[in-house]
Amino acid sequence: MPEVSERNQHGITGLGHVLTPGEIDVSHGTILYLEDVMVSFDGFRALNKLTLSIDVGELRCVIGPNGAGKTTMMDVITGKTRPDSGKVFLGQTFDLTRMSEPVIARTGIGRKFQKPTVFENHPVWENLELAMKTNKGWLASLRSKLDRAAQARIEETLELTHLERDAMRYAGELSHGQKQRLEIGMLLMQQPALLLLDEPAAGMTDHETMQLADLLNKLRGTCSMMVVEHDMEFVAALSGDTGRVTVMAEGSVLAHGTLDEVKRDEKVIESYLGR
């Protein structure tokens, strides 16, 4: 059997022990792999031989014009859309094209849409508690007692998301940016192997955007992430000088490299940045 390491608190595996059933094999250092993925809707080719990979612990920003196929790509990864052809693997273990959407979610892929989804009539603490107990109904979850380790995880997540002072506030009272961070915290409570974030900075103030960038940068290296975004300042805050950025256009990868490299690419300027 291939050898991989134990998962850390965010669900990542690496080198170290014998692979057990249900565990993600990332012994080659790759958490997500897509090859020649094709998707068509009524004759329109949404994805056209899309090929890309994401390393374990990487924070990958994906940019591109509207209609480039970014959302369709996420739909394929999460099982919402079935590709016409191509390969989509989580690590070397799971062929996502053969799995249903609920099974993929349980396997370790968390997705955050642009609009935050939280339990507005429950306090922040209970939102995190409910997210951690996804195998139970919400009422049973609230009635069951947390052990000390679970309480510590919630406290750590509150601190990480800068919501420790808002733990007892109802989620509906939070600002838009706070709700976005809360939902990311809820996803982290499920210990995902990969987080997909679709325009998480949309609608945020500049201060909230930088708070979110700080949160995601803290997760870099411990949680693999794909961030689809249009806000180039936010992308710059996430990618820095060395982070990799993928530019999509017409359903495939147009360019790939550091942010400075893709911004100088003539194809990118013509297709996206120059518009």
Predicted regions and their residues:
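The feature captures the beta-strand-to-loop junction immediately N-terminal to the Walker
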Residues: 63-65
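Catalytic Walker B motif of ABC-type/P-loop ATPase nucleotide-binding domains
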Residues: 195-199
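Conserved ABC ATPase "signature" region
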Residues: 22, 141-166, 214, 224
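ABC ATPase NBD Q-loop/coupling interface
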Residues: 87-106, 146
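Conserved ABC ATPase signature
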Residues: 170-174
